[in-house]
Amino acid sequence: MSAPEVDQSGEIGHVHHPQRQVLLDFMKHLKLNGFLRYSYPMPDQERGEGWMLFLYERLSDDIINSFEA
């Protein structure tokens, strides 16, 4: 399974993936690592397919890279 696509280039970051369950698992991973500032997954209307969630605080590369989908 592919890893979620994390984009933190703007003031509010976002995470994209074709499967909602991967984002739910990513949320659990964030919570286990003490990160609680994110939205719930929603359909990705900008891309027209897949799912996305918002990040309201910058993630470290270690947290992103330690996630296994």
Features from the language model and the residues they span:
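Intrinsically disordered, low-complexity segments enriched in polar/charged small residues
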Residues: 25-26, 42, 63
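Acidic, low-complexity, intrinsically disordered interaction modules
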Residues: 32-54
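N-terminal acidic leader/helix
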Residues: 2-32
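Helix N-cap motif at beta-to-alpha junctions
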Residues: 19-22, 56-62
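Short amphipathic alpha-helices in soluble, non-transmembrane regions
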Residues: 30, 63-69
